[in-house]
């Protein structure tokens, strides 16, 4: 008996598919005119290659655990508008970009936003029109939800049953009793886990050296697992598949009788049915181009599509399950009205209303004045009373939102301290290679490739110092090798049982210590957190930089770029501190996600150490002087490390500090300790703790699923001078990047900030947004059921899709969400003309702003302007920004 699933008209393709179906980017040929020729035909081959590349472009990569960073899951959609992307994704997936009405109702009830913000949101899209009826409809929808449901419920909306274009496994699962979707996920997950294993498994896959598809094909031909579950004849089916990925994909699509106009959409449905493994195989392709030539081979991603398609075809043929694809094409040109169209429209408005409410609150905290060299303030500006005229210390932090609280309290405790904000890799993109290893980790944003390798070395000093440090280096190598040997003994097939019988008792002592004496273990960790992160165990090998072609001139270029990016080219304080940051947790597989994103998910301490060493080099200072940057002889630069879990500062390489600065260091340490205590006190309510010691204990609590909130709550980025925000609480929600337009007449520094740090901040913002709004697709579920797989990722339970996003514990506690899903609001203190030049030059920045992925406000000559999607600027009144939108004074606009 044949099961025919004729798609109803409301499952047709939306008009948003039209651009993708009409034209290919390479040769402007519509996919629907594919001739039924052999795959070997060069013309067909080129079109298939282009088709697969376009599918791959929509998927965002997933980084391994050791380098895990926040990634924008929607990065491949930036050429579309934010709301169009929502409609586009829902054609082939259950993806959701908008929070639920329950979410908006709860925040409206709590006063997070008001009617004026709803009105402003409506006027943004329809200026000058009478929108009173639409506003009344939105308010009615909010009130209805308040009275009919629990407005404190989840942030994400309810899922629909199936997307319009779904996999065969999804459709059969919806019509039958067997969940073939989960079975296929488990089968693919089982194979991918073994194929990419990095040493966790005792027995490695015999086909791990083959490409993913070929390895799967060899295994699937002899694996009876899925046949036992009901898919009979699968081994024979796989044996008859073509040997190459591209040929297999074409063969399987034709076997399903899918019209060529739907190939791309159907492949996207398969990619988004496994977002984790799709992202992981996309990452594998990125690693095929380490030199940045742009010629990457995404063979494994294509292999994953072929594998998923194979299961679909086998299921379709085994159960005689067919889809009437012609009904989809029949309604392809129709304008589809979603069943949730009105609700969706309301949620679009309410999302923007909440963003405007936050923007108003942020801008209200900033002084309204023209930032000039003579600091002429208007009546609304109050100069902080504790601001010193000449700083004794200048301390640079990462732009990470967790630095905002600490910087504020540091300046509050001591007015002679000035803080600056810069990307935490300090402009030094390198691979950090620990002593005794041949390779290391990249300490740079993932958008950049490392320019050189920074190696640790044995100490060149003599006497007891050399003996001590050489011993330390040897111990590091021995400890690493010992851990590997110990792990092999624990997991070996022969020794694992005897290991438990003989050594297990001793492990009980460590278990008892963890449970009964947490304060003792905590004191050991907190006193020297840098040693846990290997940030100053051994000196750095600068001679190796020269061997790689990074001579003094290039080293000078690097630190000159660093100083210019910070806006620190004169008026140096006697003591300059470069403070990297990292997190300190125990038993946390996703620990890298709490470290410095600008350092690729690693500690920023090595970057700070290298930058300090280079800036103290008199030869480099001489070259900087020749370039117009004079570092006084009495200025000394040191490195530090901000522990974001405990909010403590670890001071690095203090043995290199001259005697003239020792007393200053001691004073600064006392100031930092006081600031640490104040910062922890401010964070207490957020983590529901009663004393600051509890926050410190979280760093060593192996049962703690939420050691810190990370970057939860991030909502904006401010690019401007510190005087604009000094003494003002921004609630730890703002990326703060130092910038002074008066020292950047050509706009080069502004361009570098908008094209790099702002993009990284946007990625982080979108990762938190997506994991909050759509945790099923872009989150990673509950930490308590995570299992590390292959040392590179985590599974939720014992199989299925790779978990790609943030866990629930990083976003909220129970029904209370710590992260509020808002798109990034960037505030730039610069002229609109200079910003426009950057936007006009860089299409990716233009896409982010004009397509609604990022919002921007410029503070120009004391006035505030909002960037509009058409490239113009809308002036905002300072006392009531929302109401000012109704005036719509359009200014400028060159794009």
Curated annotation (Swiss-Prot):
One of its GO terms (molecular function) is zinc ion binding. InterPro entries: DabA. Keywords: Cell inner membrane, Cell membrane, Membrane, Metal-binding, Transport, Zinc. Zn(2+) binds at residues 398, 400, 581, 596. Its main location: membrane. Pfam families: DabA. Its cofactor is Zn(2+). It is a peripheral membrane protein. Belongs to the inorganic carbon transporter (TC 9.A.2) DabA family. Forms a complex with DabB. Part of an energy-coupled inorganic carbon pump. This is Probable inorganic carbon transporter subunit DabA 1.
């Amino acid at each position: 008996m044949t099961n025919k699933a004729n798609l109803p008209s409301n499952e047709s393709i939306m008009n948003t598919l039209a651009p993708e179906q009409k034209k290919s980017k390479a040769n402007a040929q519509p996919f629907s005119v594919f001739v039924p020729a052999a795959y070997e035909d060069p013309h067909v081959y080129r079109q298939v290659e282009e088709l697969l590349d376009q599918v791959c472009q929509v998927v965002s990569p997933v980084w391994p655990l050791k380098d895990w960073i926040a990634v924008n899951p929607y990065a491949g959609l930036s050429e579309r508008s934010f709301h169009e992307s929502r409609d586009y994704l829902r054609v082939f997936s259950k993806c959701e970009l908008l929070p639920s009405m329950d979410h908006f109702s709860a925040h409206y009830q709590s006063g997070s936003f008001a009617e004026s913000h709803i009105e402003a949101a409506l006027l943004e899209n329809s200026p000058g029109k009478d929108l009173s009826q639409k506003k009344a409809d939105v308010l009615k929808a909010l009130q209805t939800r308040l009275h009919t449901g629990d407005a404190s419920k989840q942030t994400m909306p309810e899922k629909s049953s199936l997307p319009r274009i779904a996999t065969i496994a999804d459709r059969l699962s919806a019509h039958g009793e067997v969940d073939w979707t989960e079975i296929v996920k488990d089968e693919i997950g089982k194979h991918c886990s073994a194929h990419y294993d990095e040493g966790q498994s005792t027995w490695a896959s015999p086909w791990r050296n083959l490409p993913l598809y070929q390895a799967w094909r060899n295994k699937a031909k002899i694996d009876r697992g899925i046949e036992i579950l009901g898919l009979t004849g699968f081994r024979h089916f796989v044996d008859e598949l073509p040997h190459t990925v591209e040929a297999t994909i074409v063969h399987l699509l034709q076997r399903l009788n899918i019209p060529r106009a739907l190939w791309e959409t159907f492949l996207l449905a398969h990619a988004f049915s496994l977002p984790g493994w799709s992202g992981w195989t996309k990452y594998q392709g990125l690693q095929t181009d380490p030199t940045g030539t742009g010629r990457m081979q995404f063979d494994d991603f294509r292999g994953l599509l072929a594998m998923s398609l194979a299961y679909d075809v086998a299921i379709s043929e085994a159960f005689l399950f067919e889809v009437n694809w012609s009904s989809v094409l029949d309604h392809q040109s129709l304008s589809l009205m979603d069943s949730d169209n009105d609700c969706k429209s309301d949620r679009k408005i309410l999302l923007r209303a909440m963003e405007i409410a936050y923007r108003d609150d942020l801008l209200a905290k900033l002084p309204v004045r023209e930032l000039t060299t003579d600091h002429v303030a208007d009546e609304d500006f109050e100069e902080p009373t504790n601001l010193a005229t000449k700083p004794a210390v200048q301390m640079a932090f990462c732009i990470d939102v967790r630095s905002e609280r600490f910087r504020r309290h540091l300046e509050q405790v001591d007015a002679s301290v000035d803080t600056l904000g810069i990307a935490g890799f300090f402009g030094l993109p390198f691979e950090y290679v620990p002593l005794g290893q041949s390779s290391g980790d990249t300490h740079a944003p993932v958008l950049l490739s490392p320019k050189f390798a920074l190696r640790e070395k044995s100490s060149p000093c003599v006497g007891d110092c050399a003996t001590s440090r050489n011993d330390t280096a040897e111990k590091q190598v021995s400890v690493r090798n010992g851990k590997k040997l110990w792990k092999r003994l624990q997991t070996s097939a022969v020794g694992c049982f005897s290991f438990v019988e003989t050594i297990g008792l001793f492990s009980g002592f460590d278990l008892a210590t963890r449970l009964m004496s947490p304060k003792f273990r905590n004191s050991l960790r907190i006193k020297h957190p840098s040693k846990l992160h290997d940030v100053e165990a051994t000196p750095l090998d600068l001679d190796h930089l020269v061997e790689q072609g990074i001579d003094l001139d290039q080293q000078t270029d690097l630190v000159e770029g660093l100083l210019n990016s910070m806006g620190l080219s004169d008026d140096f304080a006697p003591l300059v501190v470069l403070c990297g940051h990292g997190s300190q947790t125990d038993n946390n597989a996703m620990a890298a996600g709490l470290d410095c994103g600008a350092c690729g998910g690693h500690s920023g301490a090595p970057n700070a150490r290298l930058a300090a060493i280079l800036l103290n080099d008199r030869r480099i200072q001489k070259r900087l002087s020749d370039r117009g940057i004079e570092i006084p002889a009495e200025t000394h630069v040191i490195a530090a490390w901000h522990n974001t879990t405990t909010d403590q500062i670890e001071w690095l390489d203090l043995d290199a500090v001259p005697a003239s600065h020792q007393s200053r260091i001691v004073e600064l340490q006392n100031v930092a300790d006081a600031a640490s205590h104040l910062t922890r006190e401010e964070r207490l309510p957020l983590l529901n703790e009663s004393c600051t010691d509890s926050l410190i204990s979280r760093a060593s609590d192996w049962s703690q699923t939420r050691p810190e909130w990370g970057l939860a709550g991030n909502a904006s980025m401010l690019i401007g001078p510190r005087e604009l925000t000094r003494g003002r609480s921004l609630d730890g929600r703002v990326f703060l990047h130092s910038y002074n337009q008066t020292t950047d007449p050509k706009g080069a520094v502004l361009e570098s900030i908008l094209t790099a740090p702002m993009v990284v901040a946007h990625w982080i913002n979108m990762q938190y947004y997506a994991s909050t709004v759509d945790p099923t697709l872009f989150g990673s579920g509950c930490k308590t059921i995570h299992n590390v797989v292959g040392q590179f990722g985590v599974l939720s339970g014992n199989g299925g899709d790779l978990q790609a996003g943030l866990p629930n514990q990083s976003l909220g506690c129970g029904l209370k969400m710590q992260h509020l899903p808002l798109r990034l609001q960037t505030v730039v203190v610069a002229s609109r003309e200079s910003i426009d030049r950057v936007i006009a030059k860089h299409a990716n920045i233009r896409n982010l702003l004009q397509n609604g992925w990022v919002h921007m406000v410029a503070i120009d000559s004391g006035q505030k302007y909002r960037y509009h999607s058409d490239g113009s600027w809308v002036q905002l009144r300072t006392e009531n920004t929302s109401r000012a939108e109704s005036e719509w004074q359009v200014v400028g606009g060159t794009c």
